[in-house]
C-alpha cells in the first residue's frame, strides 16, 4: 500500500491501512524533528510474554542436560528441505552464532547476540546473512519443545557452541540469560548507505577512517568483504580492514587470528550456482515463503548447489572436525586467485595433494580444491598475523585454548558482568573483559555514613555531580559501566575531562575517608552522597524525602580494570550536565537522546532528570546555561515553570546558545543551550515539561525525579534483580 489507496492482486482498492506506510509517518513529513522512538522501543505492548514473565528465572528451570543432548542430535539430523553439508549442520550453526555475536561493536556496545535481533530486519536480510534463516528454522523444533525456558537469543548462540563441541573442540563454557526482543531495534546505527555493500565507509588508503561506531566495512557485512577491499583481492589491504574491524569488536591480534582460523576450520562457503536465481531476502520475500528468503525456484539450490556468499568451497580437508588443518593448508601451500562458479574471487592452492582436498558434500568419491578468502590470505601475508598463525600451527593445543576463550568472549561480550550468567557451564574464572567487581559490604551503618556526608563541606552540586558522573557510564547495550566498582577513581575515568578531575579529586578525598571510617565501599558512599544532596535540596523545597538506597557495591582495583577498554565509555557529551567536549556534526539534543537510550531511560525520565539537575547546580564547570532559577540547590520545578512561561522570549545568541529575555522589558534573564530549549520546542517533550510545571505537580516532580535518579544509580546492580 502507498498510504492512500492499496491495491491487492485482484485490483480491489481499499482505503484502510494507510497509516502502516512509512511514507505518511511524522518522520517522513518532518525528518529533522527530534525522534524519541528509540526511547520507547521494546515495551510491554510488543512483548507477548506478559509483564510477569521473567526469562532469567524461567531458564533456570531448563533441563540443561536434555536440552544440550537434543542440540547435539540436531547437528547430524539432516533434513531434505535443507540438507546438511557432509551430514553435519555444524558449519551452518557456527556461522549463524558468529554473525549474531559479530555484529557487536565496542564503541557504543550495540549489536551483538544478546537480544536475538538476528530474527528481525535488517539483520535477517543482510547480504552477509544469506541462508541463516534456514539455520534458525532448523532450530525451531527445539525452540518449540523447550518453549519459554529457552530464548531465541540463547539458542542462537548456544547452537554454535554445541556445534564446536560436536566436532571435537573443548569449549570454554557458556552462560544463559539473554532475553529476546520482539521487533527490530531502532537505536542501532548500521550506517548511512542506501544500498547493500556500498563502498562509502572509508576516505583514505590506510583504512583507518571507518566511521564511529561502525565496525563492518560495508553495509550488510558482519566483518570484512571476503573477496577483498571493495570486492578487489588485496590481502595486505584486507589485513588493515580485519585489524580495524576486530579491534572495534574488542579483539586483539591473537584473538583475531584465532577466531578467523577457528571459524574457518569447519564448514564451507557456498557459491556453486548463479546468484541471479536466488529469490529476495526474507523481508522482501513473498508471503507464501513464510519468512524464508533467498529461495532458488529455478534450479536445485540446495546441498552442493547452494549459493550464499558466492565463494565456493571448504577451508580444510575435514570440515566437520576440529583440527589444525586450516594452518596446515594455509601455510604449506601457495595460493592463486580463481573465480568461483558464482563469479566471486577466491584463493585456491597450487599443486595440492589429492588427499588434502575435502570431499564433496554429497558424494565422498568426489574431491574439490579447498579455498581461502582474502581475509584468510591476510593472515598468511600480514607479518604480525603470520607470526601468530605459525605459533598456532606448531602448538594445536594452544590454538584450541586461545580460540575457545576468544569464542567465549565473542559470544558473551555484550552480556555484561559475570553475575548475569546463568547455568551449569559458567566458567569459574573471572576475565578482565568482564569488568569484574568484588562484592561489597552490606552490613555497615548507612545512617552514620549519611550523617558524615551531610556534615562534610561538600556542596549539593558536588555531591550530585560526582554520583551522576560515576553512574552515567552505564550502557544498557552491553551492560558495561555504571557506579558499581567506583572506577571513577581509577584510570582512565579519573582523568576524563567530563568528570572535572580537579573537582573530582577533592570530592573523592572526602568520600574515601568516610568510606574508610564507616566500612562502606567508596562506590556506595559516592551514590549515597548524591542521595544526601538530593534529600537536602528537597528539604529546602519543603519536602522531606528519603532517596532509596541499596548497599553492597564493591570497589574495583586497577588489576581488575583494563584501562584501555574503558576509553570507549568516556562521555564526550552529556546533556544532563549541559556539556559538550567539542562541537559535533550531530545536534546536541540528538547526542543527549543517544546517551539517554544507552542509559535505559524513557523520554519523561530524561525530562524530569534534566529539569532537576539544572536547578541543583550540576552543570559541567558550573556554567549557568539552563539554570532557570534563582534558588540553585533547591529541588524545585523552576526549570519547567520558566521554560513554559510565555512572559519570556528566546533569542538566538551564538554557537548554539540562546538568551532568555523578558518579553516586555527585553532584559536578559538566563542563557540556554539547544538541549534546554528542546524541552519546550519538541511537542512531546513540551507535554512532559508542562506536567512538571503545573502548580499541583511540585510533589510529583520530586517523586519522579527521585525515581529516575534511583534507576540510574542502580542500573548496573544486577545483584539486586
Curated annotation (Swiss-Prot):
EC number: 1.11.1.21
Keyword Iron listed: yes
Top EC class of this enzyme: oxidoreductase
Post-translational modifications: Formation of the three residue Trp-Tyr-Met cross-link is important for the catalase, but not the peroxidase activity of the enzyme.
GO molecular function: catalase activity; heme binding; metal ion binding
Active-site residues per Swiss-Prot or TrEMBL entry: 99
Catalysed reaction equations from the record: H2O2 + AH2 = A + 2 H2O; 2 H2O2 = O2 + 2 H2O
Gene3D superfamilies reported in the protein's UniProt record: 1.10.520.10, Peroxidase, domain 2
Binding site for heme b: 264
Alphabetically ordered keywords of this record: Heme, Hydrogen peroxide, Iron, Metal-binding, Oxidoreductase, Peroxidase
GO annotation, cellular component aspect: cytosol
Protein's GO biological process: cellular response to hydrogen peroxide; hydrogen peroxide catabolic process
Sites of the Tryptophyl-tyrosyl-methioninium (Trp-Tyr) (with M-249) crosslink: 98-223
Cofactor(s) needed by this chain: heme b
Cofactor note: Binds 1 heme b (iron(II)-protoporphyrin IX) group per dimer.
Any Pfam family hit: peroxidase
Cross-link (Tryptophyl-tyrosyl-methioninium (Tyr-Met) (with W-98)): 223-249
Site residues (Transition state stabilizer), renumbered to this chain: 95
Record family assignment: Belongs to the peroxidase family. Peroxidase/catalase subfamily.
Record HAMAP family: Catal_peroxid
Quaternary context: Homodimer or homotetramer.
Function: Bifunctional enzyme with both catalase and broad-spectrum peroxidase activity.
Name this polypeptide is given: Catalase-peroxidase 1
Organism of provenance: Legionella pneumophila (strain Paris)
Gene that specifies this protein: katG1
